[in-house]
């Protein structure tokens, strides 16, 4: 039987390689917030992750990503909005995570929070895309979300987020993710048990 006495395990993915990446700064701020609530957090660094299909999935960076996804009980995806959508940097990370690895499903039943940053006015195109991807990855995406407009104005020089309604929303999102993860993590097997898969297994075994 799985032991759920450990803190909720939250993996952060972000979608920019810039030195002062606002999607990374937003993810790091969210990580600090949810850590104070009691979660354990890990971040995947997308630098040196090859393009999907460029190398075998035995590549060390791919294996690191897959192991982190399997370790996680919840995830946070943070992306800039680029041409009305998420960046290729984030999409490449998601594309490397398969729906199945043998009998293991690296994302099924995980909770998911989505966040985006914009250089201009507030937009929701990136978070909407991430919600669609979360559904395809069989994840439980929480209702709340964060969209930070003019992100270059919202962070101190040290990378921490300024006190503002945008930061308040990030706190709300992390609080909701923490609660949903606690509520769902020991019920994933029950919630993801499907008639069609049971039927297919009977036909295969029979």
Curated annotation (Swiss-Prot):
GO terms for biological process: protein homotetramerization; response to metal ion. GO terms for cellular component: cytosol. FMN binds at residues 16-23. The keyword Oxidoreductase applies. Its EC number is 1.6.5.2. Its cofactor is FMN. Gene3D superfamilies: 3.40.50.360. One of its GO terms (molecular function) is NADH:ubiquinone reductase (non-electrogenic) activity. Disruption phenotype: No visible phenotype. Sensitive to the oxidizing agent menadione in the presence of arsenite ion. Decreased arsenic and chromium accumulation. It holds the Pfam family FMN_red. Belongs to the ArsH family. Has high NADPH-dependent quinone reductase activity with a preference for quinones with hydrophobic substituents. Also reduces CrO4(2-) and Fe(3+). Somewhat active with NADH. May be involved in response to oxidative stress caused by arsenic. This is NADPH-dependent quinone reductase ArsH. It comes from Synechocystis sp. (strain ATCC 27184 / PCC 6803 / Kazusa). The gene is arsH.
